[in-house]
Amino acid sequence: MRRPNLDRLRLKSRQGFETSVSKPSTPSYSTYSLSPTFSDKSVLSPSTMSDSYALSSTYTAGSSYQNGESDYFGSLPTPSSDKSSTSPFPYLKGSFDDRFSSTHSLTRQPSPRSPLTPLKGNTRASPEIRYVSDFTPPSSPFEDMQASVHSLPLSGCSIGPVRTNHSSSLSNSSNSLLQTESSLRPNSSFVNSPFFPLPSSDDLFLNDRVINLFLFYEKFSYLFTHLLSAIKSRDALSIPSLVLSLQEELFNLCQQTGTFYLLQHNLLQNFEFENPIKLHFDKIIPYFSRLTVLTFSNRAFIFPDHTFPRLQQSAEDFLYHLQFFFTLCANNSLYLSRFCYYPSFVPNTPFGGKWTNNGLSAVSSAYRTRLLEPCLPELDKCVWFLLKNCDEFIENFSDFADEEYVFEICSTITSHSEQIFNKLESWDMSIYFDKDLSECEQATNFAVQSYFVTKQRCYDLLTDLVCSSQDLMMEHSNDFSTMPTMIASIAVAFQTLFENVCDFLKVRAALVDEMQELATKEFENKFSNANTAKDDEPARQTNKGTTRISRSSDFTAVSEMSKDTLTLGRNSLQSILMLDNLLTNKVVQSDNNVKGGTLPALVHYLVQNVHLNKDFRHSFLLTYKTFTTPQELFTLLVILFHELPPPGLDATAYSSWEKGDNFVTKKNVCTVMNLWVQKYFFEDLKARNTLYLISEMRTFLRDHVVPSFHIGSVILSEIDNLWTEEPPDSLTQRLLSSPMATFISLNVYAYTPEEFASQMTLLEFDYLKQIPSREWIFRSWVSRDSRSAVRNYINFSNCFTYWIINCILEKKNTKARTAVISFFIQTAYKCLSLQNFSTLMSIVSALNSAPIYRLHAAYKLVKAEDIICLSGLREIVETKKNFSTYRALLRKAELPCVPFLGVILSDLTFIDEGNPDVLDSSPHLLSFNKRHRLADVVADVCRFQSSSYEMQSNTDLQSYILHRCRFVNQDLSYLFDKSLSLEPRSS
């Protein structure tokens, strides 16, 4: 008797669960700055940079001091204290890199022109160094820093060789960094260097410290202000250094917000906000690359006149998407705050220490999951399917169940249990014992203990369930009596476990809100003081004259955005739809037609205009799966249903809003859901994701809609009807199921062309009406192995064409072949009168095929009126000018009508492949015009499917045609050779 392998489950019920968790032992890592330290605003000017530091800052390996104060720059030279300088960021005290440095293990590459001199000074050796996989490792041991060679990634430094000289003291190095006697002179290696490859290292990590996003934004504001000013004044020497500074800050932003890490490890797919974050990030990098290429593609940085407008356009495009990215991060704690403050269990993170439990060997938390909240739905889904399958097995199990069925029960339970165990084991709870979170130890102590007890209870119950299923494999063991009790206990245990985890998150959220509030107040005080000092600064001098650059300038990146928009405080905990109120051009309209927009904005427009714009409603619900998923659409509808009130409402205004706009919005959301389920729910009802979505919809409707709206019960009934609806009766399937022997002696040519044309029209229309709308949208016919209704129709049309060719060639004498040709010409003409363009096209295609077209002797005997008729039919199906004649006839055709399938498929393919998914003018907006065109084509097909023919059906003739077409010879080479044997080529 086979048993599923239980070794992989690593069951722990007999080993116990350790309830004490020690603080993770975080290893020591070398710390490096990924941004230059600006000690003087003039450092951005090329005239202040020495030749030996051509467009580059100095990066030197360092380590943490033992006295507890971290030196985030290692032995990086710093300006001398007696040097009078003005920081380019006056609201920052000291170097802003003290707050934004990253603990990244990097190495350095020597300049091809000058090797590095031995490193001296107060640099300390680190007991451990982790080398990045895509960087060059040191050529000598790290403890021996003499003559060591390192490389620095292009994503974290300036382009081109870096030359440093550490033979002098720190103060001399500092003076060397800021020496001003030489001007900027790019070299050949600099010009030919690759441009900014993004990091692809496993050592990218998520920051565990507080990130003040507004300070980042102010840095970009300052740099963009001066960059756009330099472009406007055509200050060619300042542009390269400003672009490089932007590059360094962009790397810092993506590094410290965790964007690089999440994209590299494909973790954004776990979030409902994946699309907007990834969409704007995918736009930021190309636009910045374009700006970089334009900047550094000119030798000696002599820009032609036409380059400056292109530079300005590229910079503005980059700024535009960067603002979206900033605002999106700031207003979604689900994205930014979670990675900075909340339990963040991320695989392969370089910090986190080790911890043990259940008597197992120590497992590094680098391999554990640090994203706790997104894991809850995944675990919930696994538990839900386990319980659902167990219920089905109990219901269907009997004393006479065969071995294969019992093995299926055992395998399924074992597989689901294994998934649940793996997900539970991947949760690293040691984050709650971090030294920075000591304030919440008392609050979390009870929750932690409850979590451990409940987790052990889940382990025990799952183990008992697996063992019980294993017992069924033994002879004379079919007792399922304890299964229902086990299932109920498992459900209760996991419900308690989820509640424990939610308690963790609530405690952390309260603490984080308090920390953010304090940080925000502290920053606002510094910001107000910094603005006062900044207004007293002298105007910045440029080579074109004196220009005053202030925060109210047209070039300022902050522009109309307020500080509150970018503050990570309590007010940032809002849905993504609230972001649309802060930004413009989210939905683009032309002549009352929606051309495009972001997904949340399109859903919002759908809800607000569900009764006013029926064309948009139909197009959206018909094509939504081409740009989103059912789960995401449902999530956005739920967010709109729970729409937040506008800020600042008093009790009276709130009551008015709740009874007015909010009530209408909720009612419209219910209307959209009802239409979606009733007419546009094209999902596979056997798929797991569909079952889980339907379960969520039921819960939402039962808990939130039914108590307030009667339509909630209607939608629940429609969901139940999804399984009770029977597929439409198919004439072709019934005919194909009839035996072939009945029709062997049937003579097709005993029927008139009119009768044959009418029966073919009924067959073609039956194939057409079997095609659901989703197959037109998703192009299910592309794969030849597809079993879609469109593919069945295509196969029948092709087989019918080959059958006509075989019917003509199977006649031994010329007169007989002539009679068959005339029969099908007259049939095609009758199809034209019936507006059956599909059969018409198949017949003409067969007569135009190489094996038939060359039968000149047979065509000479065809009547003149039939030849004239064939000539007119050929003009109708002529392909030139994109079937212009056929399209004109189709527009005038009245229902019922059978269109030519090939033209429909061509139009759908052209629309799908010939039109971008986003707007050319606004790449961050989805192109809804493309979806409108798809919906228009499908609407025409649905119109043809709606009206059927009222003709008598001849099942004998129809069955004969179907069976003959099913087994027809489609070897064109054989058919052509047979044609040659009947009418050899003339000499």
Swiss-Prot record:
Region listing for Disordered, in residue ranges: 1-50, 100-130, 529-552
Domain named N-terminal Ras-GEF is located at 590-723
Location comes to: Cytoplasm
Instruction: Name the GO cellular-component terms.
Output: cytosol; plasma membrane
Q: Its function?
A: Has a role in chromosome segregation and cell morphology upstream of the ras1-scd1 pathway. Promotes the exchange of ras1-bound GDP by GTP leading to its activation.
Q: Which PROSITE patterns match?
A: RASGEF_CAT, RASGEF_NTER
Establish whether keyword Cytoplasm is in the entry: yes
Superkingdom, according to UniProt?
Answer: Eukaryota
Q: Locations of Polar residues compositional bias?
A: 40-50, 102-111, 540-552
Give one Pfam family.
RasGEF
Keywords in alphabetical order: Chromosome partition, Cytoplasm, Guanine-nucleotide releasing factor, Phosphoprotein
* PANTHER family, alphabetized: GUANINE NUCLEOTIDE EXCHANGE FACTOR, RAS GUANINE NUCLEOTIDE EXCHANGE FACTOR EFC25
Name of the protein described by the UniProt record: Ras guanine nucleotide exchange factor efc25
Q: Where is the composition biased (Basic and acidic residues)?
A: 1-10
> Would the keyword Cytoplasm turn up in this protein's UniProt record?
yes
Residue ranges occupied by any Ras-GEF domain in the UniProt entry = 752-985
A single MF term (Gene Ontology): guanyl-nucleotide exchange factor activity
Compositional bias (Low complexity) spans?
19-39
- Which residues are recorded with the post-translational modification Phosphoserine? 552
Biological processes annotated in GO: chromosome segregation; establishment or maintenance of cell polarity; Ras protein signal transduction; signaling
> What gene name does this entry carry?
efc25
Organism of provenance: Schizosaccharomyces pombe (strain 972 / ATCC 24843)
